[in-house]
Amino acid sequence: MLDIKRLRKDFAGIREKLQTRGEDISGLEKFGSLDEKRRQVIVKVEELKSRRNQVSQEVAQLKREKKDADHLIKEMRDVSDEIKGLDETLRQLDEELDQLLLAIPNVPHESTPVGETEDDNVEVRKWGEVPNFPFEPKAHWDLATALGIVDFERAAKVTGSRFAFYKGAGARLERALINFMMDLHHDKHGYEEVLPPYLVNRTSMTGTGQLPKFEEDAFKIREEDYFLIPTAEVPVTNLHRDEILSADQLPIAYTAYSMNFRSEAGSAGRDTRGLIRQHQFNKVELVRFVAPEDSYDELEKLTGHAEKVLQLLKLPYRVMSMCTADLGFTAAKKYDLEVWIPSANTYREISSCSNFEDFQARRANIKFRREAKGKAEFVHTLNGSGLAVGRTVAAILENYQQEDGTIVIPEVLRPYMGGMEKFEA
């Protein structure tokens, strides 16, 4: 949620920045007109209150002079009734403005590239060498099926499309990756491990920005106002909702493993095969609560933590700075890590690392005090995938495939796999 004071002070400037997102900003325009109406109502209320006070003094004077004041008393009552009606109008306007604020996206940071499509995203750096196979590389779903480690056909029978049934060494690989990532972020990067609920309430989904705009993308529990989480970002960020932290607590860093559930409503026809785009998938999340002046340094740090996973797995990747049109609703700045997928001959997203500044903190009311009796300020929140596990499985299968159909297991994972060195049929 944007700072309403900032919006009122620099409406034209914010509108100009939001227009670079290429989104419908009619809600912002409506906010401007409603806010002006609200200002006019406030002026009218103040005028009426001033008149009521004046009439009250005149009534008192007439009574002291033992003169008739009935006409003024009636006027005072009429004015009070009008004020009461305008107060109700103000209440309704404030509710409408609050709802409009919830639907306005975050303002892009000045360092975010301006662009109209994903083609305008900017490559920041690359790491690792793209493999040069002496054979035609196979897609991960074909490799996994041939090895019997992921069963897509039976998953479709049990549930439907965009689900996977991990089996045997495949299930063990998924678990090994989760443990490896969690150990790395806890032991080496200093994150506190948390295990969140997979169901959250409407207030939590609103706090992190999934609601109200993206409700159709969420899985909702029938007859309960609960939602299956689309990412651990939701429960973990809301861990400190409606709290005032102390400055010495910051930065707070959490890492969480969770299952994630997404309807992929806008992805019809995209990535219908394999592990890239699933309705249910595992992910290790990184969430940080920081002081505002530190948040962009913290974004670089968090992004580096996600990169370290790929480096230790020796998977080639690149870091992209997402342009204004590809930024997402809540972020002021976002990096995507894209891992090399040989069968597609391209890089694919495996992590997004975002700085939301105070956008989520305002929605979730998360503050901190620099001094014990100081004014409470909103924290800045950041999050990133560290990493999406299914996509990491896909990248390992494709980048470590051998001509005979076997898959070499990355060395860093072998202790988690009981010393296993390769997958073979």
UniProtKB/Swiss-Prot annotation:
GO terms for biological process: selenocysteine biosynthetic process; seryl-tRNA aminoacylation. L-serine binds at residues 231-233, 285, 385. Its EC number is 6.1.1.11. It catalyses: tRNA(Ser) + L-serine + ATP = L-seryl-tRNA(Ser) + AMP + diphosphate + H(+); tRNA(Sec) + L-serine + ATP = L-seryl-tRNA(Sec) + AMP + diphosphate + H(+). GO terms for molecular function: ATP binding; catalytic activity, acting on a protein; serine-tRNA ligase activity; transferase activity. The keyword S-adenosyl-L-methionine does not apply. SUPFAM superfamilies: Class II aaRS and biotin synthetases (SSF55681), tRNA-binding arm (SSF46589). Pathway: Aminoacyl-tRNA biosynthesis; selenocysteinyl-tRNA(Sec) biosynthesis; L-seryl-tRNA(Sec) from L-serine and tRNA(Sec): step 1/1. Its main location: cytoplasm. Keywords: Aminoacyl-tRNA synthetase, ATP-binding, Cytoplasm, Ligase, Nucleotide-binding, Protein biosynthesis. Consists of two distinct domains, a catalytic core and a N-terminal extension that is involved in tRNA binding. Catalyzes the attachment of serine to tRNA(Ser). Is also able to aminoacylate tRNA(Sec) with serine, to form the misacylated tRNA L-seryl-tRNA(Sec), which will be further converted into selenocysteinyl-tRNA(Sec). This is Serine--tRNA ligase. It comes from Halalkalibacterium halodurans (strain ATCC BAA-125 / DSM 18197 / FERM 7344 / JCM 9153 / C-125) (Bacillus halodurans). The lineage of its organism: Bacteria, Bacillati, Bacillota, Bacilli, Bacillales. The gene is serS.
